[in-house]
Amino acid sequence: MTIETSVQRIARLTPLEAILASFQSRIAAVMPRRTPLSQALGAVLAADVQPPECPPRPIALRDGFAVAAAEIAGAGPYAPMPLGLTACRVDVGGALPSGTDAIVPLDAISLRGDRAEAVATVAPGEGVLAAGGDAAPATALRRVGERLRALDLAAMPAAGIAEVTIRSPRLALARATAARTPVLNAAQVTLSRCAVKAGCAVSEASSLAEALSEGQCDALIGIGGTGSGRRDDAVQELARRGRVEAHGIAICPGETAALGFVGERPVLLVPGRLDAALAVWLLIGRHLVAKLAGGKVEDMPTILSLRRKVTSTIGMTEVIPVRCSGGMAEPLGSEYLSLTALTRSDGWILVPAESEGFAAGSEVAVNQWP
């Protein structure tokens, strides 16, 4: 029987907290750059978004007649008052003529031939959006460190914003093996889409060795080859070209993941299994990307009660998929997360390393999948 002496082995599991703490001192934010707003979805702002005054002059918030409110003071159904010489028909969004300060709605106007009369009073400013009412230079629309959302990309052009200053890490993805199995393909596609959603500029290298040798990225994620299989050598390849900080991380799934550096570039090696790759992204990858972008991970969990108990091993940080219904979260698996569990789930919960799990009925924070 042949004994393999060069196989990759995990000597110890590094706590997740230690991995995340190492980011703070070892990883710096990338340089900011200007980019068209339309291309910045998910990116982290490197400067406040300061708008010009918007609108630059008062505009109508409703269809009607622009008037000087004082000229029709006291108008009513039994005391109609003719509109003044400054009155003018305007549509929503139209600029108010000089000398007017309110909009009389059409249902408060009585037309008598070619004469328009107000049958209700309006207060100054009623039906009007003042200059700077949508946005003013003194108030940032979004601040440095915040992530741009789809709503921001829709609203900011209306305030005159065409470009923004962002930090968008260049992230390279590389397979550790030439094999193109469905599961490995799924892991790569998932990580690529997660990274793009997180504001990264993603490229795909032809091989892990090539990606480790080139310096055209800010960070690298290698997929597959982190275990002790006969063809697994991703960690050894990293050791040859850089340094391995940790091989084996106390997370589940994904415990064969590794972290290291080539020069100052961080390298995250994730298992080729879809569930493990996804868990490593959730627990480590997105924090790495957020540090490079000068932002932070922002979860907006929903608090639900656990339908049945969850057990976990002390010392391991665990990702558990859950299905949500009737205000309850039902755990769908642990350790190995099947494709069925992943696709049927509505989100995931985190079991921290210091916990043995949660009892049935416990309140848990359900996070959305990326």
Regions found by a protein language model. Give the residues of each.
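N-terminal intrinsically disordered, low-complexity, charge/repeat-rich segments that act as generic
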Residues: 1-26, 191-199, 228-229, 233-241, ...
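Phosphate-interaction motifs
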Residues: 2-161
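Flexible glycine/proline-rich
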Residues: 33-38, 46, 60, 135, ...
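Structural motif
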Residues: 65, 79, 87-88, 101, ...
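Glycine-rich beta-strand-to-loop/alpha-helix junction loops that act as flexible
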Residues: 92, 175-177, 201, 219-237, ...
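Short glycine-rich, flexible loops that bind phosphorylated cofactors or substrates
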Residues: 150, 228-230, 276
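Glycine-rich phosphate/diphosphate-binding loop of Rossmann-like nucleotide-binding domains
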Residues: 155-216
